[in-house]
Structure formats: structure tokens, C-alpha cells
């Protein structure tokens, strides 16, 4: 395994560990999710470029589209929770149920 792959895997694992450890605040959870998506994007791009897979070259861009949608929905939920309750705790998400 080359150094680039190992660095990207470590970035993904650190983001996953941060998501598991600091899940009380919504903003930190969203930042960890973005770190995971960014490391996945870089890993997929490097793998596709190294293996010369021309048919799979759209997959990282599709991943970025889903990451942008996830970020927009997460930030809108963060704004809604913080304006309603005044704090961004993840435990407030259970209160949003009808």
C-alpha cells in the first residue's frame, strides 16, 4: 500500500473516530462527515487515475454531488434546530418528531 492510500485511509478513520467520539454537537458531526466524504473522494479519484478506468471517472463527481446535498440538508437542519432550541445538540433531533 502506497503512502497516499495510507494517508487517505487514515484521514477517513480519523474522521470516523471523530464522528463517534464527538457526536454530542451537530456541527462537529457535520464536519466529521465532510472529512469522511472528502477523503473518500480523494481515494476514489486516485484509484481511478492510477488504474486508468475511464468508464468510472464520473463516480467521484457523483460522490461530490451527494456530499453537497448532504451538507445542504445538514446545515439547514442545524439552522432549524439552533433557532428553535438555541443549541446544536444532537439529542434535540429526537424532539423534531411529530
Curated annotation (Swiss-Prot):
Membrane topology per record: Multi-pass membrane protein
Keywords noted in UniProt: Electron transport, Membrane, Mitochondrion, Mitochondrion inner membrane, NAD, Respiratory chain, Translocase, Transmembrane, Transmembrane helix, Transport, Ubiquinone
Principal subcellular localisation of the protein: mitochondrion
Subcellular localization(s) per the UniProt record: Mitochondrion inner membrane
Coiled-coil ranges from the UniProt annotation: none
Listed Pfam families: Oxidored_q2
GO biological process: ATP synthesis coupled electron transport
Highest taxon of source: Eukaryota
Transmembrane region(s): 1-21, 29-49, 61-81
A GO-annotated cellular component: respiratory chain complex I
The EC number(s) this enzyme carries: 7.1.1.2
Record PANTHER family: NADH-UBIQUINONE OXIDOREDUCTASE CHAIN 4L (PTHR11434:SF0), NADH-UBIQUINONE OXIDOREDUCTASE SUBUNIT ND4L (PTHR11434)
Function description: Core subunit of the mitochondrial membrane respiratory chain NADH dehydrogenase (Complex I) which catalyzes electron transfer from NADH through the respiratory chain, using ubiquinone as an electron acceptor. Part of the enzyme membrane arm which is embedded in the lipid bilayer and involved in proton translocation.
Family, as annotated: Belongs to the complex I subunit 4L family.
Subunit-structure text: Core subunit of respiratory chain NADH dehydrogenase (Complex I) which is composed of 45 different subunits.
Record's protein name: NADH-ubiquinone oxidoreductase chain 4L
Amino acid at each position: 500500500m502506497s503512502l497516499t492510500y495510507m494517508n487517505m485511509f487514515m484521514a477517513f478513520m480519523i474522521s470516523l473516530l471523530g464522528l463517534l467520539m464527538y457526536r454530542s454537537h451537530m456541527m462537529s458531526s457535520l464536519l466529521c462527515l465532510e472529512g469522511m466524504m472528502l477523503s473518500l473522494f480523494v481515494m476514489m479519484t486516485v484509484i481511478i487515475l492510477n488504474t486508468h478506468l475511464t468508464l468510472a471517472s464520473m463516480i467521484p463527481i457523483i460522490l461530490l454531488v451527494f456530499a453537497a446535498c448532504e451538507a445542504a440538508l445538514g446545515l439547514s437542519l442545524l439552522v432549524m434546530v439552533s433557532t428553535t432550541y438555541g443549541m446544536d445538540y444532537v439529542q434535540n433531533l429526537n424532539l423534531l418528531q411529530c
